């Protein structure tokens, strides 16, 4: 069965595993999910991720990050642009999440970028998700 919105599924699995205090979450692999995981790692929301070859297809294993007393690194995740309603932002009107404390993940013509990277490069694109 095909999935309508694999990015929303990825974010939902992360949100559920994070709220259940799991150490890692396994999900189906795709290039865009791996790129989102790379952004989350570089911004400090997850500790690491890896790709594993499964019997059928690849899987992406994301290791969640918690503080010393098990406080969550990810306070919230929200899918912005959906298959039924795409949301785009110009380079002059990029969104800021919680006044710059969070991150907006934007799909640009030069790949996935955070809102700060896209602003620095002067590119806009589709706003995929907010993470804070």
UniProtKB/Swiss-Prot annotation:
Listed GO MF terms: rRNA binding; structural constituent of ribosome
Keyword Aminoacyl-tRNA synthetase assigned: no
Gene Ontology terms: cellular component: ribonucleoprotein complex; ribosome
Keyword annotations of the record: Ribonucleoprotein, Ribosomal protein, RNA-binding, rRNA-binding
BP terms from Gene Ontology: translation
Subunit structure comment from the entry: Part of the 30S ribosomal subunit. Contacts proteins S5 and S12.
Biological role: One of the primary rRNA binding proteins, it binds directly to 16S rRNA central domain where it helps coordinate assembly of the platform of the 30S subunit.
Protein name: Small ribosomal subunit protein uS8
Organism (species): Mycolicibacterium gilvum (strain PYR-GCK) (Mycobacterium gilvum (strain PYR-GCK))
This protein's encoding gene: rpsH
């Amino acid at each position: 069965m095909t999935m309508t919105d694999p990015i929303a599924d990825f974010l939902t699995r992360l949100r559920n595993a994070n709220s259940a205090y799991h150490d890692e979450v396994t999900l189906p692999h795709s290039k865009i999910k791996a790129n989102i995981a790379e952004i989350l790692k570089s911004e400090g929301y997850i500790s690491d991720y890896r790709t594993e070859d499964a019997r059928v297809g690849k899987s992406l294993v994301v290791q969640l990050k918690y503080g010393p007393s098990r406080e969550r690194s990810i306070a919230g995740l929200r899918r912005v642009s959906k298959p039924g309603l795409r949301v785009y932002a110009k380079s002059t009107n990029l969104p800021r999440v919680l006044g710059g404390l969070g991150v907006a993940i934007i799909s640009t013509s030069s790949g996935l970028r955070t809102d700060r990277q896209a602003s620095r490069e002067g590119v806009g694109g589709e706003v995929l998700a907010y993470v804070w």
